[in-house]
């Protein structure tokens, strides 16, 4: 590489969220979430056109949340350890899993 790397930090929860009327402190049901599937080749090409050489995905790792995915075997966390409703992407629960909010198909979230 002949030039310095330029890193584009991308928070999928916000970057690809199509809800234009998010409520501060709102729930997943109220605000929704961007999805990993929405980060397409076109999106990545657009980031590259900005001059970025790398993408740093933030908030992808499973973190504490109040969202209930019990049907998929993921129970909500104790509200005392969750920041707001959506949780902080820095409150990591499992370094080897993906945040289910970012998946279209929660059971297959690792493939997305």
Show which residues each predicted segment covers.
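Acidic/aromatic-lined carbohydrate-recognition and catalytic surfaces
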Residues: 1-112
């Amino acid at each position: 590489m002949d030039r310095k790397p330029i890193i584009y930090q991308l928070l999928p929860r916000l970057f690809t969220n199509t809800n234009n009327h998010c409520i501060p402190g709102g729930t997943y049901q109220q605000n929704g979430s961007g999805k990993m599937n929405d980060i397409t080749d076109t999106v990545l090409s657009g980031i590259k056109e900005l001059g970025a050489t790398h993408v740093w995905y933030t908030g992808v790792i499973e973190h504490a949340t109040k969202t209930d995915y019990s049907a998929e075997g993921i129970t909500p966390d104790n509200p005392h350890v969750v920041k707001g409703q959506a949780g902080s992407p820095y409150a990591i629960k499992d370094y080897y899993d993906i945040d289910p909010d970012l998946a279209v198909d929660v059971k297959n979230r690792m493939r997305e």
